[in-house]
Amino acid sequence: LHHQIIPVLSQHQTPTHALQSHHHIPVMATQQPTQPPQPMMPMPGQHSVTPTQHHQSNLPQPGQQPFQPQFPQKPTHRPIQPQAPVHPMPPMPQPQLPPMFPLQPLPPLLPDLPLEPWPAS
């Protein structure tokens, strides 16, 4: 890759720019994004091999691996899913409200208890 870039830069007839462009070249930026995916792929492979050796640690390691990949996916899906369910949600609360009414009598009972001590005192 570097060999290909050097000739292209040399054509510009600006050796100074060639050096600067090398520093500014997005090669560094491209490497950063590519590095995370690459390590992620080998990481699971290595872990999968180690668990076979350590049966006990196999349980925790695999458990953590699946969770990690899921976490990034869940957050992305969560915002999308809630939006769709949010519309059906309003109708859902309505049927749920009736059960809430029986709960309302409970709060009054609590105030009754304090009311009794008041006169008693």
Curated annotation (Swiss-Prot):
Span list, region Disordered: 1-121
Origin superkingdom: Eukaryota
Pro residues bias: start-end ranges: 85-121
Its biological purpose: Plays a role in the biomineralization of teeth. Seems to regulate the formation of crystallites during the secretory stage of tooth enamel development. Thought to play a major role in the structural organization and mineralization of developing enamel.
Name of the protein in its database record: Amelogenin
One cellular component (GO) term of this entry: extracellular region
Subcellular location per the Swiss-Prot or TrEMBL entry: Secreted, Extracellular space, Extracellular matrix
Keywords: Biomineralization, Extracellular matrix, Repeat, Secreted
Gene: AMEL
UniProt key word Protein biosynthesis: no
Family: Belongs to the amelogenin family.
InterPro entries xrefs: Amelogenin (IPR004116)
Compositionally biased residues, Low complexity: 60-84
One annotated GO molecular function: structural constituent of tooth enamel
UniProt feature, compositional bias: Polar residues: 10-19, 47-59
Pfam families: Amelogenin
GO biological process: enamel mineralization
Protein source organism: Tachyglossus aculeatus aculeatus
Predominant location category: secreted
